[in-house]
């Protein structure tokens, strides 16, 4: 094997015709013979290029509605033959097989077919067979064959050939082969995962996951860690699918925090009014509803002004000028919203480093999707926590029942608590958080942290007393003892929402009654680690 290998003969068979004509013209200009199939051949011919049909090469027509067209020794022999192996060369000569030096294939759009909600039979028909077979053959023989599966690599191929007088280097072919194997792996993963869904398999014996590189990051959580951002091909609105209008490149921590922020604010449907969430280290500093988006932002910001500095702001409605004007008053890393007015965009333009992401929608907080966490030697796979409760799900367990206004705050606090790292305690007053206790090892400590945050809010805003006085309290899991509940009551809590289910529920309910609290059980836990 020599490092440089010439490209004399190419087979092109693509479903995505983007850039096809330009590629074909460039190859033809270098004297490369073009082979093709079906619609690809027609497109090339319509552009005035000379193309030889694969059916002419194999001596067999395309058959069975196109299911069989390239599955033939004349094709696979041309892809797999080792050019420096005498036996292979002799077999090629004996059977009239000509080498194929370049394969350009992109696969039937199976993923897109599934995404648009096609029926079972239509999805099956969009599973490519010949394409992956050729890709794997060409990739295995990358010592001599180039395989291109991505339109984004067309320019790189032509540049490589231009730099090497119509040849390509071994290192270049290796990189193409790696990309090709990753593509067929991702394709097979999409098919197998779709079939698992069709069969309603909760835990398939084997499961594959795949991603496409979106961004190479400067570093990971810390500067000594390498990192990259991959997308899974879904169209869920969020940081992976957003348009970045301005600002510096997103960092690993920006992406992680922005995802947490937008998933939280999506709990609040825009038709029910404006909502804002401000996030630091994937935990909410403040979350609020408002009569206007500007009011929602101000209330969320007021919850923890200190922590909001350098935070991520997520909005459930398009950013307007009034809200934009408030946001730029302090340092903010990222703002993510479904849209933005021209006036708001102009205001942000004065802050060149502020990242503005627009999504054209909100993620569905009830859409069932898969969540993963890597552990040493394996992956933990579970359904994303899309659990929700409404008024009819709540069970009043104390002598005192919450008022209508308290019920609204309790449900708001419950939605926020779902997105706080456990142990989570959230204090809410009038549709806004006033204290968030996150990530403590005991529920008592989380209640203490939330109370301290509320007291600091009072100091920062010059309030006569803690805003936690008369607040609604949410706990992401049951109170194992009454101490955490009583700490929340001492901070000013007037009503409580929690899952229930502790062996000491009776003791906790008794303590709530004695403290004059109203308490409801949800029957659902929201641990978040």
Swiss-Prot record:
SUPFAM superfamilies found in the cross-reference section: Cytidine deaminase-like, Methylglyoxal synthase-like
BP-aspect Gene Ontology terms: 'de novo' IMP biosynthetic process
Superkingdom classification of source: Bacteria
Catalytic function, reaction form: (6R)-10-formyltetrahydrofolate + 5-amino-1-(5-phospho-beta-D-ribosyl)imidazole-4-carboxamide = 5-formamido-1-(5-phospho-D-ribosyl)imidazole-4-carboxamide + (6S)-5,6,7,8-tetrahydrofolate; IMP + H2O = 5-formamido-1-(5-phospho-D-ribosyl)imidazole-4-carboxamide
Keyword Chloroplast: no
Residue ranges of every copy of the MGS-like domain listed in the record: 2-149
Pfam families named among the record's database cross-references: AICARFT_IMPCHas, MGS
Pathway listed: Purine metabolism; IMP biosynthesis via de novo pathway; 5-formamido-1-(5-phospho-D-ribosyl)imidazole-4-carboxamide from 5-amino-1-(5-phospho-D-ribosyl)imidazole-4-carboxamide (10-formyl THF route): step 1/1; Purine metabolism; IMP biosynthesis via de novo pathway; IMP from 5-formamido-1-(5-phospho-D-ribosyl)imidazole-4-carboxamide: step 1/1
CDD domains: IMPCH
Entries under InterPro entries matching the protein: AICAR_Tfase_dup_dom_sf (IPR024051), Cytidine_deaminase-like (IPR016193), MGS-like_dom (IPR011607), MGS-like_dom_sf (IPR036914), PurH-like (IPR002695)
EC number, UniProt record: 2.1.2.3, 3.5.4.10
UniProt entry keywords in alphabetical sequence: Hydrolase, Multifunctional enzyme, Purine biosynthesis, Transferase
Molecular-function annotations in GO: IMP cyclohydrolase activity; phosphoribosylaminoimidazolecarboxamide formyltransferase activity
Record remark: domains: The IMP cyclohydrolase activity resides in the N-terminal region.
HAMAP family attached to this UniProt entry: PurH
Family: Belongs to the PurH family.
Protein name from the UniProt record: Bifunctional purine biosynthesis protein PurH
